[in-house]
């Protein structure tokens, strides 16, 4: 059996020596926090794009427009959950993220924010999977509109045939018919809706509290020797 020292390949030192190293890292952590705060401020200052198209979703209350999803608030966060029309269950990586949504959603309404997930699977599949996972957040189906295509997280058979897809603000190879993302919208006092922000791929890391915990421990995410990141991951009822 490997010892902890060999397994982690970390230097062992005295408490006093460790404190010097820790304070050096703390300086870097504080600088990173300041940079993150500045980046968040810049994000909030991005220009907005008015949403001209009328999107109608299938939701627990029946037909709901994008405007309806604000639920009386001025800000809306939409998570694009990978769950295609012919899929039998939701993406396991999106499920990993979704395990964090309900905790945050206790607090978001108190900051004038509504949260909803959307997928192209029919509502009946979404509701069944939501029940299986024990989630409470609102989930609507975009099966009958272009929402996920317009926000570049769903792709067509033609995209697959050409092996091309526009994702994360760049043209690239086709990967899947569904990809993950998050979009943010604002509604003004007149009822006009604006798109303010979308993020994809590693931009979603900030949502994953479990990864943030793993980033604190000696082995970190421990994914370097896997065939792909998240290979270890299971839906929470499959471990």
Predicted regions and their residues:
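Non-globular targeting/processing and membrane-anchoring segments
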Residues: 1-76, 81-111, 128-131, 138, ...
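Catalytic nucleophile loop
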Residues: 109-126
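Residues at the C-termini of beta-strands that transition into short coil/loop
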Residues: 119, 141-143
């Amino acid at each position: 059996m490997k010892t902890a020292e060999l397994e982690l390949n970390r230097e062992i030192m005295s408490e006093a020596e460790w404190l010097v190293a820790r304070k050096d890292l703390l300086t870097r952590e504080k600088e990173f926090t300041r940079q993150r705060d500045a980046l968040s401020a810049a994000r909030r200052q991005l220009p907005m794009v008015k949403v001209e198209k009328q999107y109608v979703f299938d939701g627990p209350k029946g037909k709901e427009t994008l405007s309806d999803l604000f639920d009386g608030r001025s800000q809306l966060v939409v998570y694009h959950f990978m769950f295609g029309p012919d899929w039998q269950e939701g993406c396991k990586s999106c499920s990993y993220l979704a395990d964090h949504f309900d905790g945050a959603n206790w607090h978001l309404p108190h900051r004038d924010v509504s949260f909803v997930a959307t997928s192209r699977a029919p509502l009946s599949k979404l509701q069944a999977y939501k029940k299986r996972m024990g989630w409470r957040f609102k989930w609507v189906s975009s099966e009958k509109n272009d929402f996920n295509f317009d926000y570049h997280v769903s792709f067509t058979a033609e995209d697959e045939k050409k092996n091309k897809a526009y994702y994360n603000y760049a043209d690239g190879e086709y990967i899947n018919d569904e990809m993950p993302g998050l979009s943010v919208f604002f509604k003004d006092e007149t009822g006009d809706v604006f798109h303010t922000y979308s993020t994809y791929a590693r931009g979603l890391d900030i949502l994953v509290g479990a990864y943030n915990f793993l980033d604190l421990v000696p082995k970190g995410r421990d994914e370097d020797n896997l065939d792909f990141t998240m290979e270890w991951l299971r839906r929470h009822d499959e471990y």
